[in-house]
Amino acid sequence: MKGLPELVIGDLKVKRPVIQGGMGVGVSLGQLAGAVAKEGGVGIISTAQIGFREPDFETNTRAANIRAIGSEFQRARETAPDGVIGFNIMVALKDYDEHVKAAVDAGADLIVSGAGLPIELPGLVEGSITL
């Protein structure tokens, strides 16, 4: 990829101008996002039913999903300590605000939101490092 300029998103500088898409359920998780970020791109974790591997997913889906946001981010960060890692969070999710707050608490570099208008997103990330 010689000659391609780095990608700049706010204060973030991405060595390779590649943003991995958020593919849920169970595709864009910590392992893939970490691998992409390790190679210099932006690794994206999808929060769509992210907690499907949690033991209480069937009985407490909301809590399982919120908890898995942190654990999947940690998995990605272990693979790419200095990489750019974010989340894809659909506005249409019932617990959108909670997903965003969990991603911010985990230390996400950025959040990509679609499936609706992310009107509340700037207020939810205000005062954090998350773009």
Model-derived regions: residue spans:
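Active-site entrance/lid segments in N-terminal catalytic domains of soluble metabolic enzymes
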Residues: 1-131
